[in-house]
Amino acid sequence: MFTIVETPLYIKMVDNLLTKEEQGELHTMVSQNPDIGDVVPKSGGVRKVRFARQGGGKSGGVRVIYYNRLENGKIFMLLVYAKAKTENIPAHILKDLVKELNTW
């Protein structure tokens, strides 16, 4: 398994969308299978995966945006948002987030 690193923006968003139990399930899912999400084209390697909230199914779930740095064993959780309330995040914004991570 890999280490999950929550970015400050992700932390601000996740508590409003997922219970602590759901957050644990999500982190386990991603750390056990870091390639589960689709790579967002032109994003610098950012991945996007759907996660179903309890009682909501995938259509009532969230999208989770994350970035793998598997060579050092880390997966960075970047964003999480309700599918019903937010459209796709533009690739150039995701690419900028990756650039920011590379300064960490």
What are the residue ranges of the model-derived segments?
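Residues that recognize and position ribonucleotide moieties
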Residues: T3, R47, E87
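Enriched for short, Lys/Arg-rich terminal
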Residues: N68-W104
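Arg/Lys-rich, positively charged N-terminal/basic patches that mediate binding to nucleic acids
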Residues: M1-E21
